[in-house]
Amino acid sequence: MYRNSSRLSSFITQHHFFRIFFVVVKQIGHEFNNTIFRDRSNTLASIIMRKSIGSAVRRRRALCDFLFSSSSPSKKKTSSYSTSSHQNIDSLREDFRYASATLRRYDYETYLCTNAIDANKRAGPLALRALNCETAGITTATVSEKEIALVKLKWWHEHAESMLTPRTTTTTTTTGEKTKTTTAKPLPEHPIARCVNAVATHAKEVLGSEMNEARYVRWIKRAIEARMEDVDKGSSLFDSTADLETFARETHGNFLLVTLDCENIRSMASDHVASHLGTAIGLTNSLRGAKINARNRKTYFPMDLLAAENVSAETVYEGQIGDERIKNATHKIASAAVGHLAAARRNFAENNLGEKYPHMAKLLLQATTTERWLEKLEKYDFDVFRDELQRTPPLLTQGRVFVQAWKNQF
């Protein structure tokens, strides 16, 4: 009798706990949406992403899907995005939907981090991360598709300048009159390319002469060149951990630099933060894809680590679970990623970047998902080929990203 009463009491306690929990989550969700949709009419995202929702079912979808969710029509017709840039707004809206769908399909965690950014700051990170996702997806091609991958990457490399060159620039004459000129460089016929160009055009109108598109082109080209070198070397390994860190910094850190610069965040300290965080993300991604890469007879474990553990690349390609030598090599790469992550946060705190740039932390939310995966890797004793590491619990990830965004931390 006592045991049954105890069970009943426990059930009632749990029942009330879950009822309270879901009520709180629902209320937080409402507050979160209200914050996100406040004053959306004055942003670039308002013109690109305004779309009405016809049913309550669609509003109850995952929290991350608010990017194109409902927003009451604004009375104002103005926007920080200039409609005089000779872009068709309807087609541009479709382009951003395509970019969002690409990010959601191939890099879901980055998609969540992007959606947690304030609406008036979201378009730039979305376009740039979709571009990085697109180029990264090309490099996952097998060795037999090497030439095709190189052609695709070369196409992006050749069009980097036209993508990042604003379509419209405003100049002021000596008489005080403002004139707009349109560049003659052809824009690539690709949705993500048009998104990136729209962001560059908007940044030029906001920042004016402070925007240096040549620097953006240089950063993006370096990232694509690193991808091309990676594809070109095929199954060849990186010589050292330092080479792997350089690759990670080039492919992810450069995109972070452009993202911050587009939001007028530029300083030596912010560059260090972007560099360290990009390196941490790249190192972590090299481990996250270890199992899939092994099937394609490719690995990002550098030669110095494999030699130190007396393990061959063929052993890595087998993808055996529980191999202590591979665990040790994984631990060293993960430790390097943790070190760069800590350095990024330390630079952010020591230089008071949160006070100087209140919106900067949300642009760096990828640190949250990176740290979460590294913690999961440690939980499974750095056994990088475990199937559990390939799964991403969406609710837990959304919750963690939301909390960090709400706290304005990364």
Kindly give the residue locations of the regions a language model identified.
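N-terminal mitochondrial targeting presequence
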Residues: 1-28, 32, 36-90
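Catalytic cores of Mg2+-dependent Asp-rich isoprenoid enzymes
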Residues: 21, 50-53, 57, 63-67, ...
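Residues forming anionic-ligand binding surfaces in small-molecule and nucleic-acid pockets
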Residues: 228-232
